[in-house]
Amino acid sequence: LYYKVVDSDDWLDTDALKKVLERLTTLVARGTAPDLMICNYVYEHVEDGTSHTVRYTNVFPQNRLFDWVHVRHFRPDQNLLMHSVMYRTEVLRQCGMVLPKHTFYVDNIFVYQPLPYVKSMYYMDLDLYRYFIGRADQSVNESVMIGRVDQQLRVTKHMIDCQDLDALKGQKRLRTYMVHYLSVMMAVSDIFLLLDGSAEAHAKKAELWQYLKDHVTPGVY
């Protein structure tokens, strides 16, 4: 009924998972299964043994069904990531999502493309996902991202193409969030192309912005 992605480096807190599954079981039995279940996630820093929790208590109502009308402002560090979401499987089928094969960073597509199909959400203030970070060869390591920037660009272009954001004008908060998420993807691509610094990277940066201009309306651009 629900689909949760867990990276091979990461893990789920067993006590939190039990509570989430119990709540979903109750909601399904009542016929009020949410399209999207949201929980907190925790950065587990391997270098110094510290941790940092990303929670959404200021963004979402807790322990009840809600929709985008009830969603408040996201801080820059509060994007919905793969770590924080659990989609109802039928929603993933409905959106027709096909992830690029043999490509890193597709978790951004996974969390982004289904959002217009989400009609109901549920947030539990539980630290469910533990995100292990700090390994030298991780895909989010700076030098690794510079080397894989073409895959970041491929994912960003896929996200530009996969939704017509102007079709969401009647859902202001959803549209605002999705434009914001796409802006973050553009910014990340820009940063790593600038860090590369080569003439080829600068050309790729210009090409990406031209691609965006050619594939969205001036209002989105």
Across the structure, where does each feature detected by a protein language model lie?
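Membrane-interface aromatic/basic loop that binds lipid-linked glycans or pyrophosphate carriers
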Residues: L195-Y221
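Amphipathic alpha-helical repeat scaffolds of TPR domains
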Residues: Y177-I191
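Short aromatic/hydrophobic "clamp" motif used to bind/position activated sugar donors
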Residues: Y3
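Secondary-structure edge/capping motif, primarily at the C-terminal ends of alpha-helices
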Residues: R135, Q163-A167, S189-G197
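Short, charged, amphipathic alpha-helical segments
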Residues: K172-H180, H202, A206
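Donor-binding/catalytic cores of nucleotide-activated saccharide
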Residues: D10-Y122, Y129-M145
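Catalytic metal- and UDP-sugar-binding loop of GT-A-like glycosyltransferases, i.e.
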Residues: V6-S8
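C-terminal, non-catalytic tails of nucleotide-sugar-dependent glycosyltransferases
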Residues: Q151-T176, T217-G219
